[in-house]
Every structure is written in C-alpha cells, then in structure tokens.
C-alpha cells in the first residue's frame, strides 16, 4: 500500500483559507501531525494516497469564482472554469487568478499587501495554516502597513 498522503483542496473561491494553505502538503500516513479532513463544516478537501514524492497524475478542475458552477451564467463559464495539472496547489492557482478573484478571496487590505509585493501568499497564514488577523499581520510587518496606508 501507500505510505504517504497528500492534502487536496478544491481550487475555487469558496475554499477555506485553512484548506487553501494546506493544499499540496504531504505527510507519512502514520504521522500524528497530519491534518485529516473534514477540517470544518462543509469541508470539501480530501487526503489522497501518494508515493513519497507526493506527485499526482492527471488534471484537476478549477473554478475562478466564489459562486457555485450552477450559479455562474453559461456564457461566463468558459473563462472561469477549466483544468490544471493535478499537482497545482491552491497557492499556484491563486497566482494565476485575476485581480477580482484575488481581492474577493483575500479581502481588500490583504489584497493590497499581496499586490504591492509585501506579502507572499504563505505569509498570511500561521504555521498551523490559520489565517492571521489584520492586527496580527500589522504586528508582523508594521512598516508595510504604514507605507501602504493600511
């Protein structure tokens, strides 16, 4: 059998910050520190058995929107829905999304920090994958907040 598992979240605008931050993580199957979905109500993430390299085969779907597919008008779907390499993490997917998606998902202040290059995607999360509050982020990097007028 497999000795490793990979955390796979859903690539869309409804994915929780916690699941997005953990997407692509690989653990030994018996590692007590591994995170086992569901991590919250309505969690759609899964653990997938993988080899030691953690690589997946094929593609995975994405929806560059916070709406459910059935709620996206048919004429908009071709621009918002598609497939990416299965090894694309939420962080990598996020970099490819448009400004509207990024601002909606991060919120206006975090988006400004991200867009101005002050904060990489990972910097918004603590080591446990929890989203830092704006106050916590301000304590981590008061200079950036002052310079951007946040």
What are these regions (language model features)?
Residues 1-150:
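Activation/maturation switch segments at domain boundaries
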């Amino acid at each position: 059998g497999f000795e490793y598992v990979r955390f796979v979240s859903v690539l869309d605008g409804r994915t929780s910050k916690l699941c997005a931050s953990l997407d692509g993580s690989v653990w030994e199957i018996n590692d007590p520190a591994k995170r086992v979905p569901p991590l919250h109500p309505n969690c759609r993430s899964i653990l997938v058995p993988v080899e030691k390299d953690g690589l997946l085969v094929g593609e995975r779907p994405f929806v560059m929107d916070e709406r459910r597919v059935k709620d996206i008008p048919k004429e908009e779907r071709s621009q918002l829905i598609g497939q990416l390499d299965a090894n694309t993490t939420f962080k990598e997917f996020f970099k490819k999304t448009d400004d509207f998606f990024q601002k909606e998902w991060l919120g206006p202040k975090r988006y400004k920090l991200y867009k101005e290059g002050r904060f990489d995607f990972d910097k918004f999360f603590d080591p446990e994958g929890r989203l830092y509050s704006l106050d916590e982020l301000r304590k981590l990097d008061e200079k950036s907040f002052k310079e951007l007028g946040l």
